[in-house]
From Swiss-Prot:
Pfam families: Toxin_8. This is Conotoxin Ac4.3b. Expressed by the venom duct. It comes from Conus achatinus (Little frog cone). Signal peptide: none annotated. The cysteine framework is IV (CC-C-C-C-C). Glycans are attached at S18. One of its GO terms (molecular function) is toxin activity. The modification Pyrrolidone carboxylic acid is found at Q12. Belongs to the conotoxin A superfamily. The modification 4-hydroxyproline is found at P28, P33, P48. It is found in: Secreted.
Amino acid sequence: SDVRNAAVHERQKELVPSKITTCCGYSPGTACPSCMCTNTCKKKNKKPGRRND
């Protein structure tokens, strides 16, 4: 049963990485993609001169 429990813990680690659950130290407990920590999230860039707000 010990091996089975270990497998479950490993699986939970993969599903919920600490970086995502803690948002890299900001607002712990909230879910956010890890790319926000390194500023690598792909943002939709609005074309300059146009206002689509």
